[in-house]
Amino acid sequence: MAASTNSFLIGNQTQIPSLKPKSISQSFIHFTKPNTINLTTRTKSVSIRCASASTTVGSEQRVINFAAGPAALPENVLLKAQSDLYNWRGSGMSVMEMSHRGKEFLSIIQKAESDLRQLLEIPSEYSVLFLQGGATTQFAALPLNLCKSDDSVDYIVTGSWGDKAFKEAKKYCNPKVIWSGKSEKYTKVPTFDGLEQSSDAKYLHICANETIHGVEFKDYPLVENPDGVLIADMSSNFCSKPVDVSKFGVIYAGAQKNVGPSGVTIVIIRKDLIGNARDITPVMLDYKIHDENSSLYNTPPCFGIYMCGLVFDDLLEQGGLKEVEKKNQRKAELLYNAIDESRGFFRCPVEKSVRSLMNVPFTLEKSELEAEFIKEAAKEKMVQLKGHRSVGGMRASIYNAMPLAGVEKLVAFMKDFQARHA
């Protein structure tokens, strides 16, 4: 990368120089020691020039983070946020200091929505809401907004998150589990032809990708009730591939796995479904309130929305979700092949046709070696590989921000570990 220059104003205290990414579209920026640093005093500018050199995975100070969420963010996005942190675009303030009703933040949230609409090709008949409370809060918001206390709703439970959504809905309506994978330890997705849907169900709810168990819907069921809608929790595969939004009444997702930091929940809802909340619905769970106020009814998670906007911009510059999906398929194929070709040393319990592109759970034939595997991987700067406490084993979350080189390093380590312990 050619040397770049970043100038900003500082106060009496010297500031740590920031690194300006060369392009928001590049996933990893690698750098060497700055060759020019001129620190000055108040009202004078500071000029920082950074030379960079290419390396394999990323800067040597950073680990390869396989966390399920909060998860890794694109390094170039982090560096862009760093360069804007002190003085966003000459505004004289950080995004964290802005009024959420000021013109600066309005431009941020409006661009974030516009870019997300472009990424997912969201029809104009849908509203986009930037909310708080995580996807878990939506487990209650959905029945409160879409049905009455005695209304029927259907749930397909393919993992822990689908199960939690169903249990929360029991407080507010009459939900029914029409299929559960619990008896087979959540390793499958049902065939849709055999589903016995309730004829009067207001909605059919699925979790499109189960983060813990690594099960992903590759297609989506049709709702038999002509007045019902399909609802999907897409927290852990949101913006990982193209989705036909028109098939759904509501799509919701916590941002912290694939498109931003924790603290932001995105809801995409068909407009005709808004405005039917029950009287008991808390104001913060009423979709109409948030829609009428453009997600600004109360103070939103401003910095989190800003970060999501940077991620959306990055995904667009990569060529959109079709290109992103190709990259994700390549990473997942590499890792699953390593597991399947290990002659049973590594094992993935999930049925091959529904294996997640995002979350790859696996175990060792010799379970007593799993702790050693995680320990040795950490020494190689590959972290957060321990499986969820409810299932054990290992789990590699390889979201959009995970570079191919990170998966390649994990696969090389797996093969070396097998050679030493088989």
Curated annotation (Swiss-Prot):
Cofactor(s) of this protein: pyridoxal 5'-phosphate
Top EC class for this record: transferase
Coiled coil region boundaries: none
Enzyme nomenclature, EC number: 2.6.1.52
InterPro entries: Aminotrans_V_dom (IPR000192), Aminotrans_V_PyrdxlP_BS (IPR020578), Pser_aminoTfrase (IPR022278), PyrdxlP-dep_Trfase (IPR015424), PyrdxlP-dep_Trfase_major (IPR015421), PyrdxlP-dep_Trfase_small (IPR015422)
GO molecular function: O-phospho-L-serine:2-oxoglutarate aminotransferase activity
Catalytic activity field: O-phospho-L-serine + 2-oxoglutarate = 3-phosphooxypyruvate + L-glutamate; 4-(phosphooxy)-L-threonine + 2-oxoglutarate = (R)-3-hydroxy-2-oxo-4-phosphooxybutanoate + L-glutamate
Biological source species: Arabidopsis thaliana (Mouse-ear cress)
Cell location: Plastid, Chloroplast
Binding site for L-glutamate: 101
Protein name: Phosphoserine aminotransferase 2, chloroplastic
GO cellular component: chloroplast; chloroplast stroma; chloroplast thylakoid
Binding-site residues, pyridoxal 5'-phosphate: 135-136, 161, 211, 233, 256, 298-299
Keyword terms, alphabetized: Acetylation, Amino-acid biosynthesis, Aminotransferase, Chloroplast, Plastid, Pyridoxal phosphate, Serine biosynthesis, Transferase, Transit peptide
Chain's gene name: PSAT2
UniProt similarity note: Belongs to the class-V pyridoxal-phosphate-dependent aminotransferase family. SerC subfamily.
Annotated positions of the N-acetylalanine modification: 51
Pathway: Amino-acid biosynthesis; L-serine biosynthesis; L-serine from 3-phospho-D-glycerate: step 2/3
N6-(pyridoxal phosphate)lysine sites (modified residues): 257
Function: Involved in the plastidial phosphorylated pathway of serine biosynthesis (PPSB). Catalyzes the reversible conversion of 3-phosphohydroxypyruvate to phosphoserine.
SUPFAM superfamilies linked: PLP-dependent transferases
Main location: plastid
Pfam families, per the entry: Aminotran_5
Interval spanned by the transit peptide: 1-50
One GO term (biological process): L-serine biosynthetic process
